A protein has these predicted regions:
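Catalytic active-site module of serine/aspartate enzymes centered on a nucleophile-bearing elbow/loop
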Residues: 263-275
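Catalytic histidine-centered segment of alpha/beta-hydrolase-like enzymes
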Residues: 255-265
Length: 275
C-alpha cells in the first residue's frame, strides 16, 4: 500500500484553504458590487446652476413634478418658427452645465431645447434609478408635448440617456430618435468590465433597450465613435439590428466615448433635414 508523502498532505491542505479564501474573497467582492452598484453607475454633479450662469442665457429653468413626487429641473429654449424641439437626456455623469456647448450647437439654427436634469442631478430632488429616470423623462415629455406637437419633438439620448430615450420613445409618439453611443443594455456594458461577475443577474438598473427598441416607430439615428472604450460600438451595432423603424448609423473614425462634439450635431441636422 502506497504511503502519501507528508508534503502532499501539506500541499493539499494549503490548496484547500487557498480555494476557500479565494471563494470568500470573490463572494465579498460580488456582495460589495451589488450593494454599491448605483454609486458605480451614476455620477451626478448635484450643484444647481442657472442656465445664464452656465453660459446659456436664452434658456429658462423650469421645475417639473414627476409622477412619484420628485421635482426635477429642466432647461427650456423655445424654438423659432416651426423648428424642431430637442428633448435631451444626458449621460450618467456631470450635469447640464457641462453640456452647454452641445446645447449651443443644437439651438444655433433656431431649434428648441428641453434638457432634463435627472433626479439627483443638478438641483433635482431624489436619487437616480432606472424607474425614476424614466418617470423624469415622462414629466419632461409632458411639459414638451403640452407646447409642441409630437412630430416636432426629437429625443436625443447620450450614453446612459439612450436607455431613457428608448424607453420613452417606445411608449410615446415623437418625431425622431437620436441615440449617441447607445447600448443593448447597461448589463452588457457592465459585463465588458466585470466579465468575471454575473452582471445580468445582479444589476438592478439594466435599461434594456434591446427589448424596447422594436416598439419605436419614429426614425432613428445612431451615432457612435469607433474608439469608444466605454460602450463598445459592437453593442450599438447589435441594437441597430433590432430597430424596425427607418434608421441610419453614422460611425465616427477615431472618436472615443466622450469626444463626440459638433460633428454629431451636424450629422443629426442632416438627418432631420432629410425627413
Amino acid at each position: 500500500m502506497a504511503v502519501k508523502a507528508p508534503w502532499y498532505d501539506r500541499a493539499m491542505n494549503t490548496l484547500k484553504w487557498l480555494v476557500i479564501f479565494t471563494l470568500l474573497g470573490y463572494g465579498a467582492f460580488v456582495a460589495l458590487l451589488y450593494v454599491t452598484q448605483r454609486a458605480l453607475q451614476y455620477f451626478p454633479e448635484r450643484i444647481r446652476t442657472a442656465p445664464a450662469v452656465a453660459g446659456l442665457p436664452e434658456a429658462e429653468e423650469v421645475v417639473l413634478d414627476a409622477a412619484d413626487g420628485e421635482r426635477v429641473i429642466a432647461w427650456h429654449v423655445p424654438p423659432r418658427g416651426d423648428k424642431p424641439v430637442v428633448l435631451y437626456f444626458h449621460g450618467n455623469g456631470g450635469s447640464l452645465r457641462g453640456r452647454v456647448d452641445r446645447f449651443r450647437d443644437l439651438t444655433a439654427d433656431g431649434s428648441g431645447l428641453v434638457a432634463l436634469s435627472y433626479r439627483g442631478y443638478g438641483g433635482s430632488s431624489g436619487a437616480p434609478t432606472e424607474v425614476g429616470l424614466v418617470n423624469d423623462a415622462l414629466a419632461a415629455y409632458a411639459f414638451t408635448r403640452a407646447r409642441y406637437p409630437a412630430e416636432r419633438i426629437v429625443l436625443w439620448g447620450e450614453s446612459l440617456g439612450t436607455g431613457v430615450a428608448v424607453a420613452l420613445a417606445a411608449q410615446q409618439p415623437v418625431g425622431h430618435l437620436i441615440l449617441q453611443s447607445p447600448f443593448t443594455s447597461a448589463a452588457d456594458v457592465g459585463a465588458q468590465r466585470y466579465w468575471f461577475v454575473p452582471v445580468g443577474l445582479l444589476m438592478k438598473d439594466q435599461f434594456r433597450s434591446d427589448l424596447r427598441i422594436g416598439k419605436v416607430t419614429a426614425p432613428v439615428l445612431v451615432l457612435h465613435g469607433d474608439r469608444d472604450n466605454i460602450v463598445p460600438m459592437a453593442l450599438a451595432e447589435r441594437l441597430y439590428g433590432l430597430i424596425n423603424a427607418p434608421k441610419r448609423f453614422v460611425r465616427f473614425p477615431g472618436i472615443g466615448h466622450n469626444d463626440l462634439g459638433a460633428e454629431a450635431v451636424e450629422a443629426a441636422k442632416q438627418f432631420l433635414g432629410e425627413r
